[in-house]
Amino acid sequence: MEQATQQIAISDAAQAHFRKLLDTQEEGTNIRIFVVNPGTPNAECGVSYCPPNAVEESDIEMKYNTFSAFIDEVSLPFLEEAEIDYVTEELGAQLTLKAPNAKMRKVADDAPLIERVEYVIQTQINPQLANHGGRITLIEITEDGYAVLQFGGGCNGCSMVDVTLKDGVEKQLVSLFPNELKGAKDITEHQRGEHSYY
């Protein structure tokens, strides 16, 4: 079993919360952090108990003050830059797990432009659009520097698409890739088709 070179950031409050939960379990139990459907739009992160007999040879161990976290090797790259916190609010406390790379593993700075733009869409833009039930797909980047996008989900047939494209998505992409992208174009036909909401 390997020791991890990079830790997942678990706040002191979250570590104390895990320790309290682990104290009720069989001795030697730790936690497991994992991603279901990693690298897809449906990726979901989770934390579970990891009794001693559930540790796999290929697991990566991250040691914290009072426990260890085990991560399977498939989930590991998708948990890069992940953060776990335990937030107390008026209505109670809850564990938060942010994993910006769960849906798509991080791409290198020198990766082809289309891969870097796709990464930004999946990790930054689509999570915002998901609040409205929408999503965008990158179709291609034209030779003259335009990202061609397809809107889907709740965005399809929505009259706000032009505003969303121009004000939100295009601005965000151009500001992140100022020397490489001139703008964004939409290939979705925004006539009200039978799949659209009225």
Curated annotation (Swiss-Prot):
Transmembrane annotation, as ranges: none
Keyword Glycoprotein: no
Note describing how the cofactor binds: Binds 1 [4Fe-4S] cluster per subunit. The cluster is presumably bound at the interface of two monomers.
GO molecular function, one term: 4 iron, 4 sulfur cluster binding
Keyword flag Cell wall biogenesis/degradation: no
Residues that hold [4Fe-4S] cluster according to the record: 155, 158
Cofactor: [4Fe-4S] cluster
A Gene Ontology biological process term: protein maturation
Record's keyword terms, sorted: 4Fe-4S, Iron, Iron-sulfur, Metal-binding
Recorded family membership: Belongs to the NfuA family.
Subunit description: Homodimer.
Biological function: Involved in iron-sulfur cluster biogenesis. Binds a 4Fe-4S cluster, can transfer this cluster to apoproteins, and thereby intervenes in the maturation of Fe/S proteins. Could also act as a scaffold/chaperone for damaged Fe/S proteins.
NCBIfam families per the UniProt record, alphabetical: PRK11190.1, YhgI_GntY
Record's protein name: Fe/S biogenesis protein NfuA
Native source organism of the sequence: Haemophilus influenzae (strain PittEE)
Gene designation: nfuA
